[in-house]
């Protein structure tokens, strides 16, 4: 994600978020009427309920350029590029590429537990899949579980 966009999103959703580390997901949306904030306000409560109901730790959405455009928990990997940024060689970077490079939108990739830096080194496993419109991949999605 471009530096200015990354900095603005991390400032709004991590640094200026009134909730403490580990509870950043409680903010429905940052102040302001940007398209991102309006969309966050509309969909974030649903993703948060879905995450809790299914027992996930986090849910991620990526565009095909590798930008982490959405995360329920907004940790250090939020708003970064998994193709070029600091987490490109991370476990999450590998899971993004598995989804983006999958030969079919039906393919689901599973990744076993191992320490994940942006989650403060806690063991994490991931499930990744393309998000397709018919047969054309539009985005990639990822679910994170913690041990």
Locations of the language-model features?
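Alpha-helical transmembrane helix bundles of large polytopic membrane transport and channel proteins
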Residues: 1-30
